[in-house]
Amino acid sequence: MLWCPSVLVPLIAVAACLPVLAIGTPLEWEFAITLKSKILFVDEFWRTLASAAHEFDELSALTFDETEELIYFNDQQHRNGSIFSLRRDALMASHIAEQAIQRTGNESVGGLAYDPLNRNLFWSDTLQKKIFFASIDSKVTETPKVLVDLSQEGARPDGVAVDVCRRKLYWTNSNITHPTVESIDLAGTNRQVIIDTDIDMPRGIVVDQLSDRIFWIDDLKGVFFALKSARLDGSDRQLVLHDKHHEPLNLAVTNDAIYWTDKTTKAVWSHPKVPIVKATTTTSPVKAEEEDATETIPDIEPEPVAEVSALLRVANLSEEARGIVARTGFYQRLQKDEHCANIVRKVKERLDLMTKKKQMRSLVDEKTAQLERDHCLNGGTYIADRVLCICPTGFKGSRCEIRECHNFCVHGTCEISDRAYPKCYCQPGFSGERCEISKCSGLCLNGGHCKLEDISEKPSCECPHNFAGERCEQNSTEICALFCRLLKHEADIYVPFGCHDICEELAKDASDKIAIPQYHHLEVCMTPSPWTSNVIIVLVLGIVSCFFLVAVIVHGFRRLYKPKRPRIRKTFVVRKQARTNSSGDTPLTNRPLATEQCEITIENCCNMNICETPCFDPKLVEQTLAKSSNCKEDKKILIHNMDDDLY
């Protein structure tokens, strides 16, 4: 990579000529890394875009102001200045470095943080054991103020981080006798120790506004180190990574990963923000093709793999890696966040006010202003004095020309989430962050066809001939060949019945190695049985039909020849008068006797309730018997005579 010689200007302003890159705009870089003698800018694929600050000798910490596209960094050996600002010019393809904080003595900056609302810089001094802050709007010669003095406590402040939304400062105390993680309001009040147990030597720390958590590096005893996280109040502590043979210094977080610099390997490493129980350092190095070369990630379609190492070496560097920052999209991602929306609005108002103060333009400037307003696409806000666009939700790029959902979901529908990140809703049969993983991918072997269930979407395989199993992984030809080879040596071995044809085919080419199994009654087994299911069904239906027909015939005969209701048979016995009434008989002492006494014997009188023998008029009975009457008329006559002729 070719660089033009740098030119020194007053206030240590430096303009380094860079070759004009096709992607050389300020918003193209995603990570900035401080090496010993320069700052390296890389894109999201860790390809080197540019470098800057070559005139410095001992760089360490750095921080990034996304509102004004400024990087603040520290030089440990500069005579006059301690902290500097770096601005990249997109049009000139150059950078300008200016002194921001004057050196006050033999100081050593451990961590650096920036508050975009009040435009204050915060840094820790590991030698003086204090945390300082200063406004970048103040004079360079103005003495910084002390926010926290830890010199009397024996503490050693190391990493610092600003919670812009909740107006707090977090720092790590790396004193091995009593290490802590503490917080304080940016106004200097309400100091709290949020973590003081199960910690050895905390180093770099960062606040993740997207997840409302803090992440820090813990340099453990021996050769071990750990990445840990907790909520902003210190609760819900999690171990993200525990590994060895690293000397990490500073870290940065993005939406889904953590990145840190390692002095031992001179590299940048990454790991997912999700806690992993166990991880092993990857041994696949990234080859450096030239100075400060980084790994180029090929632009290929990701494929599902069985297992991927969580720890990744993303960049090999030619010098010792120290500080690192990442572009988080703070003003785009947190416009709707309940804690950050007010801060984002105030920062935008301040930027608009700064822009309005400088809008004293001529007619030529008005034409230029129109071009500037058209510079930001899709409703982006143009910051004139910084030559950058603040994009609305769902867009990115130097001119907000890139729609984040464009080609993001491979097999699904893309929507912008509440966090302003693209989110995919996958089609049936696909999964993954971008719906790039097919449930059928690599499932069916040996030419099997994969299909999905309609409801459960569970994949299954339709196997070709001579293959079986859930994934068509079982080759029946190979299995049968094994049985038939064993049969050649052991005649009594059992061979599955389906292997007969396969072994017979294989024996044509290798008859000396393959034996054909002989089955008893093979012809009978091969001949299809006549008692198939269709025959059985027809036979059963015939038998049932016969039984039904017999039942109908029997019922018809019973209805036809059903016996009639039994008739009531009557027997009449007529006798002469046995005795005459005596003078003492009265109707109350003896029943009156007719001239002739009658007696009736009734059989089969199931429908009558006659408790005593009634008397009948013999003449009436004779008339009745002479007539052809039915049972009902007989009953009426009997009952009538009982009621009328009892006495």
UniProtKB/Swiss-Prot annotation:
Entry GO MF terms: Wnt receptor activity; Wnt-protein binding
Recorded topology in the membrane: Single-pass type I membrane protein
Residue ranges annotated as Cytoplasmic topological domain: 556-647
Extracellular compartment residues: 23-534
CC per GO annotation: plasma membrane
Superkingdom of the organism of origin: Eukaryota
Intervals holding LDL-receptor class B repeats: 119-166, 167-211, 212-257
Location, primary (coarse class): membrane
Carbohydrate-modified residues: 80, 106, 175, 316, 475
Signal peptide from the UniProt entry: 1-22
Disulfide bonds: 376-389, 391-400, 440-450, 444-461, 463-472
Record-stated family: Belongs to the cueball family.
PANTHER family noted in UniProt: PROTEIN CUEBALL, VITELLOGENIN RECEPTOR-LIKE PROTEIN-RELATED-RELATED
Record-given protein name: Protein cueball
